Swiss-Prot record:
This is Imidazoleglycerol-phosphate dehydratase. It catalyses: D-erythro-1-(imidazol-4-yl)glycerol 3-phosphate = 3-(imidazol-4-yl)-2-oxopropyl phosphate + H2O. One of its GO terms (biological process) is L-histidine biosynthetic process. It is an enzyme of class 4 (lyase).
Length: 195
């Protein structure tokens, strides 16, 4: 069973993330940041992961700690659910359009955290959501899932569309990378024998 539950409890946030990598896209979110909930739903639906994320944070200050810590906690949950990564595809990629916007996401469950984020949003906020926080979410995920992640917004005039294509592509790329590779016969996908 490729499932995990992780709780992160700090002076700034308390977050619980549950993930089932072999789910069907069932999702439940209560982070206190509505736009983040909307983006997390994209990961669940397009990744076909069952996700349940609950967060309480110091959103009276701003949303930064909550968004970043949700990324951290979700990254930890993915790492735990994947275990030694035996038998997974390891690499995943996706291009996703939404009207005029197009994004590409490429992921490698390499064990080496690295975020390469090339996104120029057309405005600083989507509703009340600060677009800089999307990067903070992904940085938290990358650092704690141990993945190399390339995110490119290739075009877009609408910041909401840009952000949504990124999260949808992220879900699809994660799905591909985390899938079991029947041809690998349970091997660790590395010539080193470890990830």
């Amino acid at each position: 069973m490729r499932q995990a539950e992780v709780t992160r409890d700090t002076l700034e946030t308390r977050i619980t993330a549950r993930v089932d990598l072999d789910g069907s896209g069932k999702a439940a979110f209560a982070t206190g940041v509505p736009f983040l909930d909307h983006m997390l739903d994209q990961i669940a639906r397009h990744g076909a992961f069952d996700l349940d994320i609950r967060a309480e944070g110091d959103t009276h200050i701003d949303d930064h700690h909550t968004v970043e810590d949700v990324g951290i906690t979700l990254g930890q949950a993915f790492a735990r659910a994947l275990g030694d990564k035996r038998g997974i595809r390891r690499y995943g990629h996706a291009y996703v359009p939404l009207d005029e916007a197009l994004s590409r996401v490429v992921v490698d469950f390499s064990g080496r955290p690295g975020l390469h984020y090339f996104v120029s949003y057309t405005r600083a906020r989507i509703g009340s959501f600060d677009v800089d926080l999307a990067r903070e979410f992904f940085q938290g995920f990358v650092n704690h899932a141990g993945v190399t992640l390339h995110i490119d917004s290739l075009r877009g005039d609408n910041a909401h569309h840009q952000c949504e294509t990124i999260f949808k592509a992220f879900g699809r790329a994660l799905r591909m990378a985390a899938e079991r590779d029947e041809r690998a016969a349970g091997a660790i996908p590395s010539t080193k024998g470890a990830l």
